[in-house]
Curated annotation (Swiss-Prot):
Function comment: Receptor for angiotensin II, a vasoconstricting peptide, which acts as a key regulator of blood pressure and sodium retention by the kidney. The activated receptor in turn couples to G-alpha proteins G(q) (GNAQ, GNA11, GNA14 or GNA15) and thus activates phospholipase C and increases the cytosolic Ca(2+) concentrations, which in turn triggers cellular responses such as stimulation of protein kinase C.
Subunit note: Interacts with MAS1. Interacts with ARRB1. Interacts with FLNA (via filamin repeat 21); increases PKA-mediated phosphorylation of FLNA.
The keyword Ligase is assigned to this record: no
Similarity annotation: Belongs to the G-protein coupled receptor 1 family.
Membrane topology: Multi-pass membrane protein
Gene name of this polypeptide: AGTR1
Cytoplasmic side: 56-61, 126-141, 217-239, 305-359
SMART domains: 7TM_GPCR_Srsx (SM01381)
Protein name: Type-1 angiotensin II receptor
Main localization of the protein described in the UniProt heading: membrane
Record key words, sorted: Cell membrane, Disulfide bond, G-protein coupled receptor, Glycoprotein, Lipoprotein, Membrane, Palmitate, Phosphoprotein, Receptor, Transducer, Transmembrane, Transmembrane helix
Length: 359
């Protein structure tokens, strides 16, 4: 917990009540290494995903629009990751100035909200495409998808404003280091608890409930369709993938959200124990690695479930250029979930079973 002291040379000077919290040699080695791995893998994977979706698949479906925007949001975040790697390797000494402190912090916040919102919209799109394919046709258009993505980027930018406003460079007098951190003028301020709860609720809880509901309804619809056509072999991979998508999202973000909430309690002075502060400050960068590494893999995780994406991705790796004219159908970001024309899965046993193509 930090307490305000004075201002000198434009940089606020503060005291740290728990100066040793989170400051361990293994953190200063492990975290920059993990950040570097995330940067290389993320830049490579997301850049290829953008090329495949835009140049090979020609951006023809709603799902491809969401997937492309997810990859672009990840790339925006990844470009700032070397700054955080250097910051941690220098034992939390920020050498890049106040401007980059704000931009890099806003990028982290922006990626969180943009990615989560895009995944939520994708789950709704998959629900409409599978459970209500005919009724949702007029709503599931490229124009609607693009407008939705613009709104998501605006909302994510709005949610990132607190990082630009309140994240600054501070000089900690009792440790003699300059840090890039959040600092609130009053311990009684409602601002930190408000920002923390916004991140917990808007950045995780509500999106998770929507994603869980969407895929649960998809699960039930597919299960019902299999029961109608009992003579058809059941593809259990479909249900495993639905379960994997939900669990992948949940376990990627839960640790980070929990420690974010604990960090808010420390900032407010509710938690005074430096031992707990040490646990939180030590665990926080690890949870960030888990959340954002999984986040940066999302375009590949979802894309590789589709035959078209996988095919063109491998072509790109072999330096095979895209054809001048493409008739490909990117079927999802979660990928090729297709539903054969019927909005009523139980209406007729003669109708084809809905299929979740996993290639």
């Amino acid at each position: 917990m930090m307490l305000n002291s004075s201002t000198e040379d434009g940089i606020k000077r503060i005291q740290d009540d728990c100066p040793k919290a989170g400051r361990h040699n293994y953190i200063f080695v492990m975290i920059p290494t993990l950040y570097s791995i995330i940067f290389v893998v993320g830049i490579f994977g997301n850049s290829l995903a953008v090329i495949v979706i835009y140049f090979y698949m020609k951006l023809k479906t709603v799902a491809s629009v969401f997937l492309l925007n997810l990859a672009l949001a990840d790339l925006c975040f990844l470009l700032t990751l070397p700054l955080w790697a250097v910051y941690t390797a220098m034992e939390y000494r920020w050498p890049f100035g106040n401007y980059l402190c704000k931009i890099a912090s806003a990028s982290v916040s922006f990626n969180l909200y943009a990615s989560v919102f895009l995944l939520t919209c994708l789950s709704i799109d998959r629900y409409l495409a599978i459970v209500h394919p005919m009724k949702s046709r007029l709503r599931r258009t490229m124009l609607v998808a693009k407008v939705t993505c613009i709104i998501i980027w605006l909302l994510a930018g709005l949610a990132s404003l607190p990082a630009i406003i309140h994240r600054n460079v501070f000089f900690i007098e009792n440790t003699n280091i300059t840090v890039c951190a959040f600092h609130y003028e009053s311990q009684n301020s409602t601002l930190p608890i408000g920002l923390g709860l916004t991140k917990n609720i808007l950045g995780f809880l509500f999106p998770f409930l929507i994603i869980l509901t969407s895929y649960t309804l998809i699960w039930k619809a597919l299960k019902k369709a299999y029961e109608i056509q009992k003579n058809k072999p059941r593809n259990d991979d479909i249900f495993k993938i639905i379960m994997a998508i939900v669990l992948f999202f949940f376990f990627s973000w839960v640790p980070h959200q929990i420690f974010t909430f604990l960090d808010v309690l420390i900032q407010l002075g509710v938690i005074h124990d430096c031992r707990i502060a040490d646990i939180v400050d030590t665990a926080m960068p690890i949870t960030i690695c888990i959340a954002y590494f999984n986040n940066c893999l999302n375009p590949l995780f979802y894309g590789f479930l589709g035959k078209k994406f996988k095919k063109y991705f491998l072509q790109l790796l072999k330096y095979i250029p895209p054809k001048a004219k493409s008739h490909s159908n990117l079927s999802t970001k979660m990928s090729t979930l297709s539903y054969r024309p019927s909005d009523n899965v139980s209406s007729s046993s003669k109708k084809p079973v809905p299929c979740f193509e996993v290639e």
